[in-house]
Amino acid sequence: GGPKPKAPGIGLLATVGDNFARAKALAGIVDAIIVDAGAATPEQIAELGAVVGLTASNHAAQLPDLKTLGADFVVIGLGADAVALRSDEGAKVLRLPLDTPDGSLRAIALLPIDVVLVEETVGKRLSVDELLNYLRLGALSSRPLIVTVDTDFAPDQLVSLRDAGIAAVCVPVERDDDLAVVSAFREMIDAFPQPPRRERGLDRSAPLVSIPTAAGTPLAPREPARPEPAPLPDDDEDRVQAS
């Protein structure tokens, strides 16, 4: 027997603005905390003892110095200066609206972007239409997707995002009361059931969700090499020529 394998979960992030008191309260609950870059000091970030991301201003000409501040990743918007993408420090998370055109999403593969964060916030319930829109962003950008959910979002809906291949959810924490909401989300994620078995046949040549490998391309089974035809023996070649 032994213990049952733990069900796969979903990442849990929180944004706290410049409120480091709330950030400290969340440090042992969430997988990463996002704070405003202008309000962060190296001492505050080190005190959190957590994975920390910084939100750059929308028109930033350069990214925050992640190494000096001790942060792990930066969140940028479409208005950021393109030169900021040249920085090789930490991971880059790009905020995108749901209505981003297909061509722009495909072009993300050419940029040093690690993760896509959806700008719009999901309300209390998740509709199939919304889910399809999120999956479009993830599939066309070939990047892991973070979905922002409101504090009113029903915790039992989190498993639907997990089953669809969403990498993580991000919760805006704007009040002290929101801390309890994030804790409830953590409890729900830790108690996730195993994903449902898919009974119908699947095309295994394409991944269910386009999450890139380290090389930046989705995993897919390799086609077996076709054997070369064996050469004809000399006497057979003579027989063919004679005929």
Model-identified regions with their sequence ranges:
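Structural motif
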Residues: 13-19, 35-39, 54-59, 75-79, ...
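A general structural detector for well-ordered alpha-helical segments in enzyme core domains, enriched
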Residues: 22, 41-44, 48, 62, ...
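Catalytic cores of alpha/beta
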Residues: 22-25, 60-68, 100-110, 151-169
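Conserved anion-binding
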Residues: 49, 54-143, 198-201
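C-terminal helical cap(s) of enzyme catalytic domains, especially alpha/beta-barrels
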Residues: 175-242
